[in-house]
Amino acid sequence: MKKTRVINKRNLSTMIIGMVTIAVAIVCVFLYVSKPKQTNKSSQSYLNGVDVDKLQKKVGKDFEGTYLLKDYVVYGETLSLYKSKYGSTETDKMQGNNIVLKNVMTDATTSFTFNGSVDSGVDLGTLKEGIYELYTYNHFEKERIYFKDAFKAKAVTTMRRDEKVTSVSFMADKNALKEYGIQFKKNYAFIIVTSQEPNEDIYDVVIDPCGNAMNYFSNTVDVGASTSVLDEASSSLEFAKKVKKELEKKGLKVKILRKENETPGYYGANGRPARAYKTKAKLYLALGASLDENVYAPYMLTSPYTNSGLANTVSYFMEQNGLTLYEARTNTTQENGVLYDSYAESDNGKVLEYELYPQLRETGGKATYAGVYGDEFKNVDYKDAYGMYGLYFSYASAMNSQSVTYYNENADAIAKILVKSIVRYFEI
């Protein structure tokens, strides 16, 4: 007679639990493997899920007037468009023009004014997901923007807002929508905005604690403004950590560009600008000290190619919150404590287009002529790069004990209001 093995209740229960555990594990592995990776998500476009029939009906194909442009610049989160090659004329014909973006699928329009500065133009950080046609006005006539040569620019990833970012693609190509059954007669310009999860390799802000910078010309380390009352290298790093902490509270990803014992300079593959460009940050915040004995409070330097928009915002909120700034400004369009960086001069006294501070010149990419000033050690890899919005914040003078005392007593408050201003300017 064949023997029958009897399974007791405890063994049966153990077997069932084991089978369920294995099944759950298989499902989890399947879900993990099939889950879209971050790189896959970043390759997706708004157009991947668009209603093709609706797109074909709504996108413009023929226009009464068209407007030819030749160049563009990206600075921070701003896209500026030019009638001539950037820098080839003193006043570009686009200056004073409105740039109108029309959302193809919703018909909503957004207008931006270009006043000639690289922080004016299309504010990419404010654009909602969608595909946009670009127009401008020529003698009060609305005309469709196009370029002679087709291109697709490198996508811009905007700063983190509510734990989200957008990927912004700018292109001009008669075949841009060919796969959707749409072709154009000219290389019309489009902007495509796609909502994405943040990529952990992309930062929002980089902070440069000034001082301890390698001078590649003399092969020595420039320690910075170092006196008996303030050491720029250590003070800047300490202040950078305060500012970083406040920025991170706002949901921004921040990188400090040097460690305590490092001495990176402003040129070459391991220089501070190179480190910054690799992060794809939108803001380059330099924190430094002055050697001017007349400076009794903080002030700011900004690129003369900008409107001083960010610096003006910082100045406004500093004074609104009872903080003192050094009484200085370059012109009446600037708030208190805001100065433009100076231009370099040639040997015969001719004013050049290059500004002096590498923290501003070498970090603004094409917009500030990065990589083209001087004869050696140029950052040539970044001369056509998208620029970071540069701000040099001088928190104290190492030659003025009153200034140092004021900074030491108010460093926390200054850091908080500086960050508040950045958040307000970029509408984080």
Ranges and model annotations:
Residues 118, 224-230, 297-303:
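Short helix/strand-bridging catalytic loops that position acidic/His residues to coordinate divalent metals
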Residues 107-210:
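Non-catalytic propeptide/linker segments at domain boundaries
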Residues 79-81, 99-101, 112, 124, ...:
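Hydrophobic beta-strand residues in large extracellular and virion-surface proteins
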Residues 184-273, 279:
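Active-site histidine-acidic residue metal-binding/catalytic motifs
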Residues 31-79, 84:
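Short, compositionally biased P/S/T/A/G/V-rich stretches that sit at domain boundaries
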Residues 234-428:
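Active-site-proximal helix/loop segments of hydrolytic enzymes
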Residues 90-108:
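Extended low-complexity, serine/threonine- and proline-enriched intrinsically disordered segments
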Residues 1-48, 81:
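Gram-positive cell-envelope targeting signals
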